[in-house]
Curated annotation (Swiss-Prot):
Subunit structure, as described in the record: Part of the 50S ribosomal subunit.
GO molecular function: structural constituent of ribosome
GO CC aspect terms: ribonucleoprotein complex; ribosome
Keywords: Ribonucleoprotein, Ribosomal protein
Signal sequence bounds: none
GO term, biological process aspect, one: translation
Membrane-spanning parts: none
One matching Pfam family: Ribosomal_L31
Annotated NCBIfam families: L31 (TIGR00105), PRK01678.1 (NF002462)
Family per record: Belongs to the bacterial ribosomal protein bL31 family. Type B subfamily.
InterPro entries, A to Z: Ribosomal_bL28/bL31-like_sf, Ribosomal_bL31, Ribosomal_bL31_B, Ribosomal_bL31_sf
This protein's encoding gene: rpmE2
Name of the protein this chain belongs to: Large ribosomal subunit protein bL31B
Keyword set includes Ribonucleoprotein: yes
Native source species: Methylobacillus flagellatus (strain ATCC 51484 / DSM 6875 / VKM B-1610 / KT)
Amino acid sequence: MKPGIHPEYREVVFQDIGADFSFLTRSTIAAKETIKWTDGKEYPLVKIEVSSQSHPFYTGKQKILDTAGRVEKFRQKYGM
């Protein structure tokens, strides 16, 4: 591999803000925030809206996931 062209692959905490669920994995995603994990170390934190803990396919519960107000934007745009 060429040096200096690959992103840093490191441990990152992903936090599902809707389900209050966090998990530690490895990723190259950039993060601005950090969080102290259960092992006492600081890790970059990435907040996500949907994970396996909140997605209807995995939970078996049907619910509307409209965190960005998409329905309201559509209604305003088309006068509904």
